[in-house]
From Swiss-Prot:
Name the UniProt record assigns to this protein: Cytochrome b
Cofactor(s) listed in the protein's UniProt record: heme b
Superkingdom to which the source organism belongs: Eukaryota
Residues annotated for heme b b566 binding in this entry: 59
GO cellular component term of the entry, any: mitochondrial inner membrane
GO molecular function, one term: ubiquinol-cytochrome-c reductase activity
InterPro entries per the UniProt record, alphabetical: Cyt_b/b6_N, Cytb/b6-like_sf, Di-haem_cyt_TM
UniProt keyword Cytoplasm, yes or no: no
UniProt entry keywords in alphabetical sequence: Electron transport, Heme, Iron, Membrane, Metal-binding, Mitochondrion, Mitochondrion inner membrane, Respiratory chain, Transmembrane, Transmembrane helix, Transport, Ubiquinone
Binding site for heme b b562: 45
Amino acid sequence: LCXIXQILTGLFLAMHYTSDIATAFSSVAHICRDVNYGWLIRNMHANGSSFFFICIYLHIGRGLYYGSYLYKETWNVGVILLLLVMMTAFVGYVLP
């Protein structure tokens, strides 16, 4: 559910965002001021990513508590997925 909300809000934000260095800040201001509920979509996207990572960390904590790390292959796939999610978040946050 978190990932679906992130994808949808990200798509709506991408419809109005320009990555040009001269107009990027203006496009964010446009999203917040001129787009209907743009401020809400931007806040949902920002806070949704934090909530998504909290859910991931709780999931990891549950796995540690119940000893799921003993299943090496499953645990390694989870670690790889965690690293991919963190890399994707970094690329989406830093590079635009």
